[in-house]
């Protein structure tokens, strides 16, 4: 059976892999949107990308912070 330390590290790395895959998927969607939306100016695209980045951080940080704190406390 996995120890708590190993299971927390495994959970952390699985989370990072899923986050990486989600970023790749959103990059592909963004490329499709840019192909359809060629008339949009650069400022509008930058603003949309910034908003998408903020949304990703808002979804990921609540998961990451408790996982990291529990990982640190289990290692210490």
Swiss-Prot record:
Keywords: Amidation, Amphibian defense peptide, Antibiotic, Antimicrobial, Cleavage on pair of basic residues, Fungicide, Secreted, Signal. GO terms for biological process: defense response to bacterium; defense response to fungus; killing of cells of another organism. Disulfide bonds: none annotated. Residues 1-22 form the signal peptide. It is found in: Secreted. Its main location: secreted. Residues 24-54 are annotated as: Disordered. Expressed by the skin glands. The modification Leucine amide is found at residue 75. GO terms for cellular component: extracellular region. Pfam families: FSAP_sig_propep (PF03032). Antimicrobial peptide with activity against the Gram-positive bacterium S.aureus NCTC 10788 (MIC=50 um) and the yeast C.albicans NCPF 1467 (MIC=150 uM). Ineffective against the Gram-negative bacterium E.coli NCTC 10418. Induces a dose-dependent contraction of rat urinary bladder smooth muscle (EC50=2.9 nM) and a dose-dependent relaxation of rat tail artery smooth muscle (EC50=37.7 nM). Belongs to the frog skin active peptide (FSAP) family. Brevinin subfamily. This is Senegalin. It comes from Kassina senegalensis.
């Amino acid at each position: 059976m996995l120890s708590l330390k190993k299971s927390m590290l495994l959970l952390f790395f699985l989370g990072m892999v899923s986050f990486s895959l989600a970023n790749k998927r959103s990059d592909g969607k963004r490329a499709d949107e840019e192909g359809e939306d060629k008339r949009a100016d650069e400022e509008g695209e930058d603003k949309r990308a910034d908003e998408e980045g903020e949304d990703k951080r808002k979804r990921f940080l609540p998961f990451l912070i408790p996982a990291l704190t529990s990982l640190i406390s289990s290692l210490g």
